[in-house]
Amino acid sequence: MSAIYNFCAGPAMLPAAVMKKAQQELLDWNGLGVSVMEVSHRGKEFIALTKQAEADLRELMHIPQNYHVLFMHGGGRGQFSAVVNNFLGNQGRALYLVSGQWSSAALAEAQKLAGDTQIDSLNIVEKHNGLNAVVLPDLHKIDADYRYVHYCPNETVDGIEIFDELDSPWPIVADLSSTIMSREIDVSRYGLIYAGAQKNIGPSGLSIVIVRDDMLKLPSLTQSSIMDYRLAVEHDSMFNTPPTFAWYLAAEVFAWLKSLGGVASIAKINQQKAQMLYACIDANPFYKNGVVAANRSQMNVTFQLADESLDGAFLKEAEAAGLVALKGHRIVGGMRASLYNAMPLEGVAALVSFMNEFAAKHS
């Protein structure tokens, strides 16, 4: 069977080595004669897995000791509400920076739970010569007392990424669902990081939360127990039965990434992949991208065909060539190639070759 390259934005492709290992031990994990899906989450074997997973993640991201690492339910949207409920209380205020669809969704959830009087927002995307560009505000000039400022460094729908570190007088809460471990960051700059697993970590159903200890002292709203960070810390992410298979696969992905040399190594590969694809887009007037170069996403490359009537043919022929899930989000249309950690350079090279051939045929 010829290679299939899956460019889905999420759930995304997993490393082939991880999938093969999971396949090999699906029915007999750790020599127990049963699947990892069937063992107790409180058994010594699974507890050992969780401890190793946390240790590996801490090593990969250089997480300081005053941060807790949580493996939780609910994905990114679950964290939209959890952040508000855990940190705002009845009087606290927060600032949301809006750069695209996912930061807008986080803002909407915060407004729903806390109301407009507690939630402020700033749109940080402007048009520069017809292209989307991020303009970060000077937060130190804002006269307000916020519990936190929330932002999403990478917008998967819009193909926008913020590479500059945010400078804030208030704790920073960041949705890193699509960029976690794709490039190095300084975790100590953040009050809380959350990430749905289904892009760079594992299958859907799991979310990673990295929270600084002092954030847990903020007043909280009444909320469901399973989304309470304090209870999650107290019970080692096992207040209730966790998504064990997703946790297992996340652990395997962490081990795989370590075997490649860690985040610094994969970051170089990710940069190569993005540069290769954007070079193809820029070199050919048949394709266009709507984001300034400084804010083009490395993880989610969005582009349009000069002739939209060819979109269907492009997708059909791409799929026949083993290049799947390239259709853009329904909100923006066009095409989108997601280049998460598991996507090999060969997959991007195959896409570029196809795009050049398609453009030559239809120009």
Curated annotation (Swiss-Prot):
GO CC annotation, single: cytoplasm
Entry keyword set: Amino-acid biosynthesis, Aminotransferase, Cytoplasm, Pyridoxal phosphate, Pyridoxine biosynthesis, Serine biosynthesis, Transferase
Cofactor binding note from Swiss-Prot or TrEMBL: Binds 1 pyridoxal phosphate per subunit.
A Gene Ontology biological process term: L-serine biosynthetic process
Single GO MF descriptor: pyridoxal phosphate binding
Entry binding sites for pyridoxal 5'-phosphate: 76-77, 102, 156, 175, 198, 240-241
Binding site for L-glutamate: 42
Matching Pfam families: Aminotran_5
Membrane spanning residue stretches: none
Required cofactor(s): pyridoxal 5'-phosphate
EC number: 2.6.1.52
Cited function: Catalyzes the reversible conversion of 3-phosphohydroxypyruvate to phosphoserine and of 3-hydroxy-2-oxo-4-phosphonooxybutanoate to phosphohydroxythreonine.
Record-stated family: Belongs to the class-V pyridoxal-phosphate-dependent aminotransferase family. SerC subfamily.
UniProt-recorded name of the protein: Phosphoserine aminotransferase
Organism encoding this protein: Shewanella sp. (strain MR-4)
